Design a protein with these regions (language model features):
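Structural recognition of the beta-strand scaffold that forms the well-ordered cores
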Residues: 129, 149, 272-276
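Conserved, well-structured interaction surfaces
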Residues: 42-53, 78-148, 158-171, 175-191
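Elongated scaffold/linker segments in the mid-to-C-terminal portions of large proteins
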Residues: 40, 45, 49, 82-101, ...
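Membrane-proximal, proline-rich intrinsically disordered regions
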Residues: 20-68, 96, 230, 259
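Short coil/linker segments at helix-helix boundaries
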Residues: 147-167, 215-238
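Bacterial Sec-dependent N-terminal signal peptides
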Residues: 1-29
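Glycine-centered coil turns and helix-coil junctions that link the paired helices
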Residues: 120, 141, 212-219
Length: 324
């Protein structure tokens, strides 16, 4: 037995002595730049397209619905006060700590992701949709906050604190959208799956133009709708005509309630120009129903969604009579 142990030990030492000693092996698990294969680039683009999904599914909805008087905050039994995060938008008395408006940084991160593609040496067909997404993120910052940073530089130079006047950002967006629109896809189905196409960029430009006098005003309190003139109105109408005349969209192809039902992804809804898809497994985050659900919905079996839910709804927002 002792002889066997000695032989095994000697054999092990010989293996160590003759083993690989050249450790200068190129590392292929680390890349100084993003891989440029089509699969890798599409994955990178998809991360840009879906970047805003989580915020869009809750905080963006809360900020828009509560501040526009469509809905108002409620606090049944003293719950869901959350420091006034839901009541402040309705009262137009925001605090920088409110979660309902604390997502400007997410838009900045989306611009950074887009810049990684835009500033690389990839083909222009990948850069154009990335520029469209960057314009979308920039538009939301400008539309919601007024002054906003123009994040069109390298990652190192992006600074969320270097804000530009709203009018300058609006003119930058106009120039950017006019440049990329001719080079984007005309496949309408792409827009319904969060992939930016020509019609998404055109619709974004139309939104920019229809509110042009507001964006050009020195400040919102200096804007007077009764006396303002819109130099971009004809251009806005022309863009809308182009979208309509494409024949790829139809407002009356199905009942309104089906367009926003749980199975609408299979219906090819023809009036959706640009949409963010959600599901319960790979694309989660849609919480629109939660805010308006019965607070103790988990006690219902089945609930009005057709199944028993393990958690209760939020029940912290209610629709105002004017919108009901």
């Amino acid at each position: 037995m002792k002889s066997n142990i000695k032989l095994m030990f000697a054999a092990g030492m010989m293996l160590l002595a003759t083993g690989c000693t050249d450790l200068d092996v190129p590392l292929k698990s680390q890349y100084p730049s993003y891989p440029n294969s089509e699969v890798a680039l599409n994955a990178q683009l998809n991360s840009i397209y879906s970047h805003f999904r989580g915020t869009l599914g809750r905080r963006f909805f809360e900020a828009m619905s509560l501040s526009s008087d469509e809905q108002t905050a409620v606090s049944y039994s003293g719950g869901w006060i959350d420091g006034g995060a839901y009541s402040h938008p309705s009262l137009h008395d925001f605090s920088y700590e409110d979660n309902t408006i604390d997502w400007m940084g997410e838009l900045g991160k989306g611009c950074v992701k887009a810049n990684e593609v835009i500033n690389s040496d990839v083909d222009a067909k990948y850069k154009m949709p990335a520029r469209a997404m960057r314009a979308y993120f920039e538009f939301l910052m400008m539309d919601c906050w007024g002054e906003a940073p123009i994040l069109d530089v390298t990652v190192e130079d992006n600074d969320m604190n270097k804000r530009q006047p709203r009018a300058i950002v609006a003119k930058y967006l106009e120039k950017e959208l006019l440049e990329i629109i001719p080079h984007l896809s005309t496949d309408a189905s792409e827009g319904r799956n969060s992939i930016p196409n020509k019609y998404m960029a055109q619709a974004l430009l139309a939104k920019l133009y229809i509110n042009w006098p507001v964006y050009m005003a020195a400040s919102v309190d200096k804007y007077d709708a009764s006396s303002a003139t819109n130099e971009k109105l004809d251009a806005c109408i022309s863009i809308c005509d182009d979208i309509i005349n494409s024949g790829k969209f139809n407002l009356g192809s199905m009942a309104y309630r089906f367009k926003f039902g749980p199975n609408n992804s299979a219906l090819n809804v023809e009036d959706f120009i640009y949409a963010m898809p959600y599901d319960t497994y790979t694309a989660t985050g849609m919480q629109y129903g939660r805010a308006n659900s019965y607070k103790d919905i988990k006690s219902m079996n089945p609930s009005y969604f057709g199944m028993k839910l393990s958690n209760s709804g939020g029940g912290y927002m209610t629709m105002t009579p004017e919108f009901a």
